[in-house]
From Swiss-Prot:
Residues 163-333 form the Helicase ATP-binding domain. A motif (DEAH box) lies at residues 279-282. Keywords: Activator, ATP-binding, DNA-binding, Helicase, Hydrolase, Nucleotide-binding, Transcription, Transcription regulation. Residues 478-642 form the Helicase C-terminal domain. HAMAP family: Helicase_RapA. Transcription regulator that activates transcription by stimulating RNA polymerase (RNAP) recycling in case of stress conditions such as supercoiled DNA or high salt concentrations. Probably acts by releasing the RNAP, when it is trapped or immobilized on tightly supercoiled DNA. Does not activate transcription on linear DNA. Probably not involved in DNA repair. The gene is rapA. One of its GO terms (molecular function) is ATP binding. This is RNA polymerase-associated protein RapA.
Amino acid sequence: MPFALGQRWISDTETDLGLGTVVAVEGRMVTLLFPATGENRMYAKEEAPVTRVSFNVGDQIATHEDWTMTVEEVQEKNGLLIYVGVRTDNDEPVALKEVFLSNFIKFNKPQDRLFAGQIDRMSRFTLRYEALINQHKRRLNPTRGLAGGRVSLIPHQLYIAHEVGHRYAPRVLLADEVGLGKTIEAGMIIHQQLLSGRAHRVLILLPETLQHQWLVEMLRRFNLHFSLFDEERCIEAFADAENPFETEQLVICSLDFLRKKRRRFEQVLEAEWDLLVVDEAHHLEWSIDAPSRAYEMVEALAEQVPGVLLLTATPDQLGHQSHFARLRLLDPERFYDYEAFLAEEQAYGKVASAAQELLDGETLSDEARQILASQLEGLDMSDAAARQQAVAKLLDQHGTGRVLFRNSRANIQGFPERHLNVYPMPLPEQYKTAIKVMGMMGGNGGDLQTRALRYLYPEKIFQQFEGENATWTQFDPRVDWLLELLLSARQQKVLVICSEAATAIALEEALRTREGIRGTVFHEGMSILERDKASAYFAQEDGGAQVLLCSEIGSEGRNFQFASHLVLFDLPLNPDLLEQRIGRLDRIGQQNTVEIHVPYLEGTAQRALQLWYHDGLDAFEQTCPTARPVFEAVRDELFELLAANTGDQVTLDALLIKTRELHEPLKARLEQGRDRLLEIHSSGGAAAQLLVDKLAAEDDDTGMVSFALKMFDEIGVNQDDRGENALVLTPGDHMLVSSFPGLPQDGMTITFDRPTALSRDDMALLSWDHPMMRGGIDLILGSEIGATSVALLKNKALPIGSILLELIFVAESAAHPQLYRFMPPTPIRLLMDKNGQNLGEKVAFDAFNRQLTPVNRHLGSKLVTASQPVIHGLIGKGQVIAEELKAGIVDKARTRMAQTLQQDLDRLEALKAVNPNVRDSELDYLRNLQAELHHLIDQTQLKLDAIRFIVVTHN
């Protein structure tokens, strides 16, 4: 290399040093000063990892005095370059010696980097191109946002999430029966709204007891990092912002907290949200004359927030007025009058009955035919297909079909059987004595509920006298029984749930010390990470725990359907909690009958509660939609019976009779009131199954796995294969970046297999929607990784020394989240020969790539320097060809956008004529969006993203 004092060079290995200046040439050594950092580097002249900086005619260059010039001529004198041209600010002619170039010049354009010798590995060029292709495909994919959740592919959930998640500012009521996954549906909708850019700020309002469950569900299932806001958090956040709720984008808050703290509620109102989610919305009490404070708060928020999701118990359970109150929150203009709503419901009831006949395939009665004809013009009942089309139209025109989704177990397949096993046991003398002493000492006070709860858990009474020691496990017959059950079913996974964390801890110790049974605990005193580890240990097939012992609160939000044995060591006083316990195993996807084991102590409140649940409500072997209203109706009598703790059979029998008299007619009424039309609409039918099939095919796509592993390799992320479809990722010592997006410093265990992720809470499910994959692609495309490369092509059919230039352009418009589904950044690949002909369409990337051999940076730089004028010319010709191709891409995007949005607009306008639930704001939004996207698509620009220079060789 001919070095001369004053020349400008750039380091190949330390590009952040900026431009270097040769300050000494002595013997075999050369010294460069890098003025931007003040550092010196001494190199051996023959092997110096530096590249000469030279610019070409037409380039714009910056000077050390912060003005720029356009180069018109390049001269050389005594080994130094002189750039002749004009200043860009005043058109003054100038001649600039290279020593006066800016010290901070960076080569961001791929052609500048190529000519400056900043040549990357060929494998990184390939990775960059694949990142562009995959990003483009993913943003066009209509299922984007659905595949990324750690959820089973359940048709009705996917359909609701897809249907609602694609709307602008969705305002809907999710009213699926318990166990059908309303929380998952809401999570998928939130995930899609955030990924598509339709929403940025989300507020979830919940009862305090559900906050942690939602926090875990959103994080573990959807990688959404919500923040819990209470008074302490608000005080902390006040240091960063006047309104603490503006310090986070995703917030979970207790409705009760806001009700008690008026100032905090005012701050929540002042913060701007895109989506409001309210769980347990049926607890928002409302009457025409006296709405509750909680209802008024949600109403005030719903008036300001564009999107609203209300999660509620099934409408039928709570009466029409309560149902109307929630619909009124979603659209007060549409649901303005309760009496009018009742009249409309009654009229719709006749339509639903007629639709029932249509669905059953029977000959339509005259009344049904007349009703359907009034709803559907040109009614054709000639065959099954015509009937199905008629049903589809009715679904679209359904009275509340756009705002209400409700599925029941009766119309959803895939749930397991439930079988109850009961084990009566004698009350130990130690408990009898403890109860007697408690009574003598006046410890039997408190309200009815407190006394009832006390007798349900006699071990707690005993421990009041014993202290910290848990010797109750030595004489309680339920412990011996549990040991025998576990020993007799060594190969079975068993989930044990009890009310208190202390009970779970004591049981685990007893099982371990007495019989060496492998178990683990799971309770609210553990961190999320500790719970993940416990869950993973339980899920592990070889060498894992046989039994997982959960507390009531600790088990919230977790599902263990790989187990089929459930032990209810004690019973909760609330029927909703009982269903929640059973729901840990009774999920869609459970392969076996759920065996429910209930031990109880005879002659105690435990026996009475077990019989009330089973003989009164049949709540163990069936889901019980009537449980809540029946429980409220007999609450005081039940509590009195339990608080007496006498085993009074006469009183118990009377209570069971009353319970059944309430339960059975209500259950029959709910069944008769089922809205088949609404259920078919909510379940999605064939459309839902198509979604499942599409997502299952995406799960089986090995291309994503291949790309991910290649990306981790190139960036420098360590990968350790742990078997069982598991891979441990940790930051490498020599990564291209200081940290990889979404990868903690202590690493992460990932899997690409959905069933594995569903059974292992300690593993992340990697998909195209996962933050690590999206962040990794953004990292590559937002940097210069792989932007330049040089390779050799061994091909004796071509003249030796022939050159090819591979140009990767990207056609993109201004960033707009709604634009991506029509015009995402689109790669355009050209393969130019020396004559400027584009061979890209004839020579596929993958096949061509396999024929190439990489070269090192120094040889690559020499090859580029020798062909620099030719490369300049080919880039110019390629730009012209790419512009022509871009025009075609823009035309297709414009047509696709216009057709899609016009179809949506036409459908909604037609629907509005027969269904008032279509909001004017939706129509206005689509019209405005159409005009805005049309303008943005027309503004699409072309940029050169990557270059690969190829030289033909015969060796």
